[in-house]
């Protein structure tokens, strides 16, 4: 239902963009299909409706007419009235309010007209001529005017520091340089515009990209919820759209908890959690991510134990060793690699075994009693699933990898829509300690712990 609503909303936005083409403020039709940016081609003279307002009434009139002022990037929406338009006697002590095209006195209600009269506003609309140019249009107006596909202009972009990142389809590539230049011109904080060449399909989660405008500089800096991050965007993975999710998990964990971030990247989870006071073990296989992880830990003046190893090895060594210390602190295991993280779940089965595993139903075993003091382990698994029957799909894959069904009281949180018919979820559940000490799937397995203590 929500996805359908969003798609319908996008269609309406696109349609409004197409309808906007017929408005007086739309860029000239001659720019359609332009592939090399010619800023001078956007110049045109248009007529705007205007109201003559006494200077002493400017503040009150501005509040009253805010919704009717022209919606355009022009230096002034309140201008000096030219003598040839209003007469010499009215140039002093008055200003012209520039209004949206199509505004007439009939646009105003009787109450508004009465209020305007009390403020000394003449009951008359003036035609004000103004020259518009490239600098007066927003980036989406320029792109909608240039590109033959209105949807192309509405797709948007992601910004990572000074880098703007677009995903262009094959039929959009002939326009890539003009798209990049327009974005560079209009987004003041941008210095580099890149287009992704391919999907993320390598083991380090970064992708090939092409600079389509601006500097060939991929080392960037961002601030997310007050924490600073620096990294080479071409060599590591970063997704600004996960900012809310980073903060959600950070808010959830307690200061006394211990966190193992299996696929830590440059630290978007690990660093804010460490800043909170938690003990953090952060790992990433990508040497570049590991390098920037260390850098960002120092940059944020916090502490985290960082590792550059395979996720499976990290769990089998660092997590296992910590659990065997019988620490009383609750443990969280973050697995943010949604494409393949589910394939790592089998590593938890028999994780605590060291040669000799418990026999089935041997609940009196002395070593088993010791295991009862092992801290609670809450896994937060990120996973992609189809929009249709996605919950059933992810439950099936988790069961296949973990070797047992997902606890009924696990929390399945919809993080975001990543593509048409594709969702990203975070599945949070408490691992059975008995399961981590036994390799056989038919051994005794106690009822799962209630997840509500683990996540709200």
UniProtKB/Swiss-Prot annotation:
GO MF entries: tRNA (guanine(37)-N1)-methyltransferase activity; tRNA methyltransferase activity
One Gene Ontology biological process: tRNA N1-guanine methylation
Keyword Transmembrane: no
Residues that, per the record, bind S-adenosyl-L-methionine: 246, 284-285, 310-311, 336
Keywords: Cytoplasm, Methyltransferase, Mitochondrion, Nucleus, S-adenosyl-L-methionine, Transferase, tRNA processing
Pfam families assigned: TRM5-TYW2_MTfase, TYW2_N_2
InterPro entries assigned: MeTrfase_TRM5/TYW2, SAM-dependent_MTases_sf, TRM5-TYW2-like_MTfase, TRM5/TYW2-like_N, tRNA_Gua_MeTrfase_euk
EC number: 2.1.1.228
Role summary: Specifically methylates the N1 position of guanosine-37 in various cytoplasmic and mitochondrial tRNAs. Methylation is not dependent on the nature of the nucleoside 5' of the target nucleoside. This is the first step in the biosynthesis of wybutosine (yW), a modified base adjacent to the anticodon of tRNAs and required for accurate decoding.
Assembly and binders: Monomer.
Protein family: Belongs to the class I-like SAM-binding methyltransferase superfamily. TRM5/TYW2 family.
Name of the protein described by the UniProt record: tRNA (guanine(37)-N(1))-methyltransferase
Annotated organism of origin: Ciona intestinalis (Transparent sea squirt)
Highest classification ranks of the organism: Eukaryota, Metazoa, Chordata, Tunicata, Ascidiacea
């Amino acid at each position: 239902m929500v996805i359908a609503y969003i798609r319908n909303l996008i269609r309406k936005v696109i349609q409004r963009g197409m309808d906007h083409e017929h408005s007086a403020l739309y860029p000239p039709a001659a720019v359609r299909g332009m592939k090399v940016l010619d800023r001078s081609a956007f110049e045109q003279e248009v007529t705007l409706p205007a109201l003559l307002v006494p200077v002493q009434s400017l503040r009150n009139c501005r509040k009253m007419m805010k919704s009717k002022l022209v919606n355009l990037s022009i230096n002034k929406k309140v201008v000096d009235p030219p003598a040839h338009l209003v007469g010499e006697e009215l140039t002093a002590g008055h200003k012209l309010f520039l209004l949206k095209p199509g505004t007439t006195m009939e646009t105003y209600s009787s109450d508004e007209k009465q209020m305007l009269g009390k403020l000394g506003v003449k009951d008359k609309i003036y035609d004000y001529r103004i020259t518009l140019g490239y600098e007066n249009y927003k980036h989406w107006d320029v792109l909608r005017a240039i590109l033959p596909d209105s949807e192309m202009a509405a797709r948007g972009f992601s910004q990572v520091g000074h880098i703007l990142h677009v995903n262009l389809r094959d039929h959009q590539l002939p326009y890539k340089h003009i798209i990049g230049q327009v974005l560079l011109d209009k987004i003041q904080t941008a210095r580099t515009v890149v287009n992704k060449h391919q999907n993320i399909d390598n083991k380090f989660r970064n992708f090939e990209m092409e600079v389509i405008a601006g500097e060939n500089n991929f080392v960037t800096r961002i601030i997310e919820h007050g924490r600073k991050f620096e990294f080479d965007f071409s060599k590591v993975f970063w997704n600004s759209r996960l900012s809310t999710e980073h903060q959600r998990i950070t808010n959830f964990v307690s200061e006394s908890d211990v966190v193992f971030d299996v696929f830590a990247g440059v630290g978007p989870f690990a660093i804010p959690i460490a800043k909170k006071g938690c003990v953090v073990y952060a790992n990433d296989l990508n040497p570049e991510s590991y390098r920037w992880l260390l850098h960002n830990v120092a940059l944020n003046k916090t502490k985290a134990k960082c590792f550059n190893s395979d996720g499976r090895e990290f769990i089998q060594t660092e997590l296992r060793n910590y659990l065997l210390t019988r620490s009383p602190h609750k443990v969280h295991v973050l697995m943010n690699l949604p494409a393949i993280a589910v394939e790592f779940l089998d590593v938890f089965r028999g994780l605590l075994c060291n040669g000799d595993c418990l026999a089935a139903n041997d609940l009196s075993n002395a070593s088993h009693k010791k295991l009862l003091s092992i801290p609670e382990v809450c896994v937060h698994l990120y996973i992609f699933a189809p929009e249709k029957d996605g919950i059933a799909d992810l439950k099936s894959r988790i069961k296949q990898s973990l070797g047992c069904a997902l606890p009924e009281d696990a929390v399945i949180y919809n993080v975001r829509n990543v593509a048409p018919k594709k969702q990203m979820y975070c599945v949070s559940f408490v691992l059975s300690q008995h399961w981590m000490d036994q390799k056989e799937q038919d051994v005794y397995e106690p009822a799962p712990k209630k997840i509500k203590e683990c996540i709200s």
